[in-house]
UniProtKB/Swiss-Prot annotation:
GO molecular function ontology, one term from the record: 3-isopropylmalate dehydratase activity
Main EC class the enzyme belongs to: lyase
Protein name listed in UniProt: 3-isopropylmalate dehydratase small subunit
UniProt subunit comment: Heterodimer of LeuC and LeuD.
Classification via InterPro entries: 3-IsopropMal_deHydase_ssu (IPR004431), Aconitase/3IPM_dehydase_swvl (IPR015928), AconitaseA/IPMdHydase_ssu_swvl (IPR000573), IPMI_Swivel (IPR033940), LeuD (IPR050075)
Source organism of the structure: Haemophilus influenzae (strain ATCC 51907 / DSM 11121 / KW20 / Rd)
Family membership noted in the UniProt record: Belongs to the LeuD family. LeuD type 1 subfamily.
EC number: 4.2.1.33
Length: 200
């Protein structure tokens, strides 16, 4: 898994608070157990006018032409509330989002996002409002996220954010739970060679 250090990208301004995981990925699309293929169902009930998902809703922000190819999602407080389904960050990541910015995230969704190599950034409500205003006024312009410096640069303004150092280390180095375990492969192998035969 590639490490995450910096990203410059377009921002989708999702002007809504308390966006729950059922809105992010509705329950009828949860049958699959792999992480791929969920992006086409992201925000399905908001994004499409029909059940089949063939008629895009032109009034939903994700369908606006100027936000196609965006890699950063901007939202209001309590993003990812509701059920604990891990499919929600799967859908966001499969669509192409790498960073989410909001005043707050539901705890389980926040951790699931980090576990799936996405960066959820908490900023104050005032800072998030400033970014919304900038995005609306600067159509087509990118913002810059620097995980090493822990900053978000929006136009000529720089915002700082916090992240647990262990989580930051994992993102910077592209490490998931398996990758972390494999860092100790030599020690694991040495231990296995020395345990009694009846325990093997």
């Amino acid at each position: 898994m590639a490490g995450f250090k910096q990203l410059s990208g377009l921002v989708v301004p999702l002007d809504a608070a308390n966006v729950d995981t059922d809105a992010i990925i509705p329950k009828q699309f949860l049958q699959a157990i792999t992480r791929i293929g969920f992006g086409k169902h992201l925000f399905h009930e908001w994004r499409y006018l029909d059940v089949e998902g063939t008629k895009p809703n032109p009034e939903f922000v994700l369908n606006y032409p100027q936000y196609q190819g965006a890699t950063i999602l901007l939202a209001r407080k309590n993003l990812g509330c509701g059920s604990s389904r891990e499919h929600a960050p799967w859908a966001l990541a499969d669509y192409g989002f790498k960073v989410m910015i909001a005043p707050s995230f539901a705890d389980i969704f926040y951790n699931n996002s980090l576990n799936n190599h996405m960066l959820p950034i908490r900023l104050s409500e005032e800072e998030v409002e400033e970014i919304f205003q900038w995005v609306w006024a600067n159509e087509g312009k990118q913002i810059h996220v620097d995980l090493e410096a822990m900053t978000v640069t929006v136009g000529d303004k720089v915002y700082t954010f916090e992240l647990d150092e262990f989580r930051r280390h994992c993102l910077l180095n592209g490490l998931d739970n398996i990758g972390l375990t494999l860092q100790h492969e030599d020690k694991i192998s040495a231990y296995e060679k020395n345990i009694p035969a009846f325990l093997r």
